[in-house]
Amino acid sequence: MNLPRFLLPVVALVAAASAHAEITWLTDLDQAKAVAAKEKKAILVDFTGSDWCGWCIRLKKEVFDQKEFSAATKDFVLVELDYPQKKKQSAEVKAKNKALSEKFGIEGFPTILLLDSNGVPFAQTGYEAGGPVKYLAHLADLSKANTAEGKAKFAQGKKDEGLVRGYGEELEKLITPLLEKKDLAAAETAIAKFIKDKAVTGAAKVTLSVNARVGSVQACKPGDHTAVLKVLDEIIADNPADLTGELKEFRAQVAAAQAADKDKK
């Protein structure tokens, strides 16, 4: 096909743009919400430390910068909120990003937060090895939680995290003197009383129990896998099955470590 000469530069520009198309990342969450509402998409927010966080840099290089990841834009409006150490940012951007990290309870980088078009979170993840195709499948699986029930469950999980953090600090102060004396029995009694008195239930109870009890065993009986397994079995037996899935996986890891130690002897 012969094209008029004045169209050739235009065609060349279009071809170049297609060949080197870049994925668009917004840097303003309010703008992203407006776009998401209009296009009926969810929002993916990357909380990153672009010039210092090793895992953030790997995630960008291995996943976000790969052409296959452009498929994510079919379902998500992409947002990057950066928390650099050397890169210059305006005071306004720093303040806005800080407020968002506090609002969503971001504690580490990279954190990938998935929101509905109104900005309500329903899932959270981070670095995952395997490249863009595997990561897209991971996002598709997480997107199943973009329901009223999923968002409520996510909100409860965040609430539990805050509860566990606060109670964990209190409990640590309470049992540290006992652990310094290697008095595991007294520490166990104090932990049980604390959880009962605070009326901690559900996933928060499981997490608090594991952190405090396993930590106590490790402090008093370092390297004793049998003692750790005993504690884990008690916690698993004392809580509903739907709350102990990850705990059972952890138990399997401890059992494997125990078996490996026996093989070395």
Residue ranges and their predicted role:
Residues 27, 31, 55-58, 68, ...:
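Extracytoplasmic/secreted proteins, especially bacterial periplasmic and envelope-associated proteins
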Residues 1-8:
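Bacterial N-terminal signal peptides that target proteins for export
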Residues 62-64, 99-147:
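Non-catalytic, surface beta->alpha helical segment in thiol-disulfide oxidoreductase systems
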Residues 8-16:
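Bacterial N-terminal signal peptides
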